[in-house]
Every structure is written in structure tokens, then in C-alpha cells.
């Protein structure tokens, strides 16, 4: 049994406060950008695909905006709509927390579509790169969730249960760490082994990401408490489970479309 005593704040300089959660976003994007370029170089070296590395650098600004705007709007719509419709000014207070992975994903797809149209390049190629590096940010984000004592797991009698004093005195599944290992480490290994060891096909990493992430998230939701302001939908499904189901469905649909059109 472990009693959680980690401080969400890394450094406090008074007016300037550095939090682990903020660093997770920053390092996730920076490391993802660096590794994404490695993947692009590998693909360009082993295929006839044409793409400018500078375009990926330009895309990062679109990515950052897409993650923040999409993640925030997704949280507002999916998880706390009634509150924010009555308190619209609270929506802009991103620093107080409240981001949705599924909302960020939708934002990334929209941002990538707009960027690809502007540059006249393949949207699915960029999404493939994002799919391969996204688990890095997901891993860091879930570790930050654990440090923050948020997205807590269900009560357990297992020896590895964690007590979060900021929540209550009950031992709980460290569901954040389960997600870090499944949606972060495992998903990263699957997608990158495939893209480095097999012949690259545009769009393949994108739909595999949707399918595998959706599956891992649904599995993790079994051990995770539902969001307090929503609870269970239809007395059984968490919002994360429902949204992840549609991710899996979208993954299979995209797979079928790409194979049909031989993209």
C-alpha cells in the first residue's frame, strides 16, 4: 500500500509556478516533435513519399492550438456542459484544469485538415506521424494526473493500492499508471515497431491508433472512477468508455475506406 504524497507543484517562485502537468504538455510536444522528424526521415528514406521537414516544423503551431482549444472545448461539451453554459467565462480558465483527450483528438484532426489543405499535402501522412508520437504525451500526461491525484481509480484491496489523501483515505487502483503503461508505453511500441519494421502505408498508423487507444482506454476505464459531475451513462458506461467506443468504430471505418480506395 502506498500513501500518495507527491506535490503537483515542482517549483514555486511566487508569481511564477511550475507544475508537473504543464511540463508534461511541454515535454510531450517537444519530444514528440523531435521523434516525429525521425519517423519522417525514416519514411522518406525508405519510400518514394514526398514531404518537406520544414512543413512539419510549421505544423507544430497548429498542433499546439488544436490540442488546447480542442481539449478544452471537448471537456466543456463532454464532461461539464451544464456548468459552463451557466458560467461561460470559466471556459477560458484553462490553467484551472479541465481538458479532454477525445476533444484534443478532434481538435488535432481539424487542425491537421486545415494545415494539409493550406500546404496541399496528405492529411493522413501527418496524422500517422502524430499517432506514433502521441503516446509520448499521453504517458507524461497520465503520470502528471497521478501526481495531481486526479482521474483516480476505484477502491481496491490489492497490495499495490494507492491512498490519495487529497481525495479520501481509501486505497485505490493507480488507474493513471495503468493508462500510462497501456495508452503510453504499449501503444508507442506497437505503432512504432510497425512503422519502422513494415512497409509504410499512408493512414495505417492513424486508424490503428484509434482502434488500440480506444481498446486500452475502455480496459482502463474498468479500474477508473467515472467523472463525478457525470457519473455513469445508462447506469453502466463512463463517458470515456462511450467516446472510446466511437474511436474504435471510426478506426475500422477509416481502415475500410483507405483500403477500398487504396490510398
Can you annotate each of these PLM segments?
Residues 1-263:
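A feature for loop-to-transmembrane-helix boundaries and adjacent hydrophobic helices
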Amino acid at each position: 500500500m502506498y500513501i500518495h504524497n507527491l506535490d503537483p507543484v515542482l517549483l514555486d517562485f511566487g508569481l511564477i509556478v511550475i507544475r508537473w502537468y504543464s511540463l508534461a504538455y511541454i515535454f510531450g510536444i517537444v519530444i514528440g516533435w523531435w521523434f516525429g522528424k525521425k519517423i519522417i526521415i525514416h519514411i522518406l528514406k525508405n519510400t518514394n513519399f514526398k514531404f518537406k521537414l520544414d512543413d512539419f516544423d510549421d505544423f507544430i503551431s497548429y498542433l499546439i492550438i488544436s490540442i488546447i482549444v480542442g481539449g478544452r472545448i471537448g471537456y466543456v461539451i463532454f464532461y461539464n456542459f451544464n456548468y459552463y453554459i451557466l458560467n461561460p467565462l470559466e471556459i477560458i480558465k484553462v490553467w484551472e484544469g479541465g481538458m479532454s483527450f477525445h476533444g484534443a483528438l478532434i481538435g488535432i484532426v481539424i487542425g491537421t485538415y486545415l494545415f494539409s489543405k493550406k500546404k496541399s499535402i496528405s492529411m493522413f501522412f501527418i496524422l500517422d506521424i502524430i499517432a506514433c508520437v502521441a503516446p509520448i504525451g499521453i504517458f507524461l500526461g497520465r503520470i502528471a494526473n497521478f501526481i495531481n491525484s486526479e482521474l483516480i481509480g476505484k477502491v481496491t484491496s490489492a497490495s499495490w493500492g494507492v491512498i490519495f489523501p487529497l481525495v479520501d483515505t481509501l486505497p485505490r487502483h493507480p488507474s493513471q499508471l495503468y493508462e500510462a503503461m497501456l495508452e503510453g508505453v504499449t501503444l508507442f511500441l506497437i505503432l512504432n515497431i510497425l512503422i519502422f519494421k513494415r512497409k509504410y502505408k499512408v493512414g495505417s498508423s492513424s486508424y490503428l491508433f484509434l482502434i488500440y487507444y480506444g481498446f486500452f482506454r475502455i480496459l482502463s476505464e474498468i479500474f477508473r472512477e467515472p467523472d463525478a459531475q457525470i457519473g455513469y451513462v445508462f447506469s453502466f458506461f463512463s463517458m470515456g468508455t462511450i467516446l472510446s467506443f466511437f474511436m474504435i468504430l471510426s478506426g475500422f471505418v477509416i481502415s475500410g475506406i483507405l483500403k477500398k480506395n487504396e490510398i
